[in-house]
Design a protein with these regions (language model features):
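Structural signature of tandem-repeat unit edges
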Residues: 1-8, 18-33, 42-55, 64-79, ...
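Short coil-to-beta-strand
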Residues: 143-145
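Consensus positions within tandem repeat domains that build extended binding/scaffold surfaces
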Residues: 10-15, 35-38, 57-60, 81-84, ...
Length: 543
């Protein structure tokens, strides 16, 4: 029995009370509020809302066994928060006169709810027909343009022309819903979060004036094969996960679309064809937007400045990427094309950054074109790891090869470095196991990291000019290469442990006059038969 003078059932009061089956409330109860998660997972079958209750909190009756809610005609109830009856078993619901805040998703997952009856005197909501409740976008509005609720057992629906917003979770989990139609004069502007998530619709044609499809709007609609967006559509935004896990086969985007949000088409296992018009205004394709899809080719729209993380991750059928000459693309982000099927790609001049693992672990990538005058400054970690490229051109502006940048590129034989290269650092494992045959050390290179060229067994020649600024060769840098001779430039300061370990073809090491060497590890040339030619003032390093 709820005490007569109790005004509030506090947050979580009866949460997880799995044996609670009955709640008695006095007829003249002073209760005014039922707070968040008050009765979560309770086994009560019915509940009468006292007349003075003004608010029911978020998830208050979530996962309850409740089937019947009694709300008196004179109820003062004004607000039902999000997910208040989430996954409950209610079958019928009355919206009283004073109800003005029926929050989005209030009956999410309540799949037995077939009838919602609105008081004729309610100022904000009304029944459109026996299946639909409509509402005003704000309490001040006089226009009923928001679809608030739909019968959870409905099989087909035509959205009234005057509806401008389909509210959050309006049709979510309507497992019998197979058909949604919009009239030619539809005024629909927005489909909100999870509006048709997990329905059984098979196709949909969007109205012209639609500007936004919210996150999860059609997510997990496993029978959805066809979406039609008119060429003159006003659609601007496709939200996160909007079509994730659908069976869409083709999609054509309108020119005015500006944003495809993260994972919008992830796991669309039938999506092979994506059409983007040449005059597209698309400005952002966010993280993982098309990951794990079988798309076969893609043209990067001209105004895209960044290909975000994981956008084409695991797109194993993706063979061709086209970047137009007027492209504004500047950044290819982390794992953007990770494990995809691209065979070749031409990097435009204005690209400034290719991030970690952007092209790594390709089974088919054989050719990548980068112009010498490219604005690219750094080749990040594992950018081209385990690709099949056989040649690479390094632009003059590149200052650093990060670790494992070309590791295990087992076809890479030729590295073209611009004569005016600004390269300063080659980090650890950068070319590990690559079969390159010759390498030119750029004049401004200061450091060769550990294992940088280790196990490059075809590497016989390393060219170093008289003007070289090379200062440090770290441990195992040239381990197990086939270098025949090597000249240590005068600016070199440190030759670390096992730098040339097991270089069995190495015959001559020449250390220049006027050298600045401060340290040579005793095993730097271990397991070689090289003759070391040193200035007389350096003999003490080898005594």
């Amino acid at each position: 029995m709820i005490p007569l003078h109790l005004t509030k059932i506090s947050e979580g009061t009866f949460e997880l009370c799995h044996e609670l089956r009955n709640v008695e409330i006095p007829n003249d109860s002073e209760l005014q509020e039922i707070e968040n998660i008050a009765f979560v997972e309770a086994k009560i079958k019915s509940f009468e809302i006292p007349p003075h209750v003004k608010r029911i909190g978020e998830r208050a009756f979530c996962n309850c066994s409740i089937k019947t809610i009694f709300i008196p005609v004179d109820s003062e109830l004004q607000t039902i928060e999000r997910n208040a009856f989430d996954w409950s078993h209610i079958e019928k619901f009355d919206i009283p006169t004073n109800m003005i805040n029926l929050k989005e998703g209030w009956c999410h997952g309540a799949n037995n709810l077939q009838e919602v009856i609105v008081s004729p005197n309610n100022p904000r909501y009304k029944n459109y027909d026996k299946n639909i409740v409509i509402g005003q976008s704000t309490i001040e509005s006089e226009i009923y343009d928001v679809l608030v609720f739909c019968n959870r057992k409905i099989e087909a629906i035509t959205i009234p022309s005057f509806i401008k917003t389909i509210g959050t979770s309006s049709f979510e989990n309507c497992y019998q819903l197979q058909k949604v139609e919009f009239l030619s004069d539809s005024e629909l502007k927005e489909i909100k979060e999870s509006a048709l998530k997990e329905t059984f619709i098979e196709k949909i044609k969007f109205p012209i004036h639609l500007t936004k499809i919210g996150q999860y709007a059609f997510s997990s609609c496993i029978y959805l094969q066809s979406i039609e967006i008119p060429a003159n559509s006003e659609l601007q935004i496709i939200g996160k996960f909007a079509f994730e896990g659908t069976k869409i086969e083709n999609v054509s985007f309108p020119s005015c679309l500006t944003l495809i949000n993260e994972r919008a088409f992830r796991n669309c296992e039938e999506l092979k064809n994506v059409q983007i018009p040449a005059d597209s205004n698309l400005q952002a394709i966010e993280m993982g937007a098309f990951c794990v899809t079988p798309i076969e080719s893609f043209v990067i729209p001209p105004h895209i400045t960044k290909i975000s993380k994981f956008v084409f991750d695991l797109c194993k059928q993706l063979k061709k990427i086209e970047i137009p000459e007027n492209s504004e693309l500047q950044i290819i982000d982390e794992k953007a094309f990770y494990f995809s099927g691209i065979e070749n790609i031409k990097i435009p001049k204005q690209i400034k950054r290719i991030s970690e693992e952007a092209f790594s672990i390709f089974n088919n990538l054989r050719k990548i074109e980068i112009p010498f005058d490219s604005m690219l400054q750094t080749i990040e970690k594992r950018t081209f790891t385990e690709t099949l490229i056989d040649e690479i051109t390094i632009p003059s502006n590149v200052t650093r090869f990060c670790e494992r940048a070309f590791q295990s590129c087992h076809q890479l034989r030729l590295v073209n470095i611009a004569s005016d290269s600004k390269l300063e650092v080659i980090e650890k494992f950068a070319f590990n196991e690559a079969p390159i045959e010759r390498f030119m050390i750029p004049d401004h290179l200061k450091k060769i990291g550990k294992f940088a060229f280790s196990f490059c067994k075809n590497l016989r020649r390393v060219d170093i000019s008289n003007d070289s600024e090379l200062q440090e060769i770290e441990r195992y840098a040239f381990e197990e290469t086939s270098i025949v001779s090597f000249r240590i430039p005068s600016n070199a300061k440190r030759i670390c442990k096992h730098a040339f370990y097991h270089c069995h073809q190495l015959q001559i090491i020449e250390i220049e006059l006027n050298t600045k060497i401060e340290f040579i590890n005793k095993s730097a040339f271990g397991q070689t038969a090289a003759i070391i030619m040193v200035p007389i003032e350096m003999i003490h390093f080898f005594n």
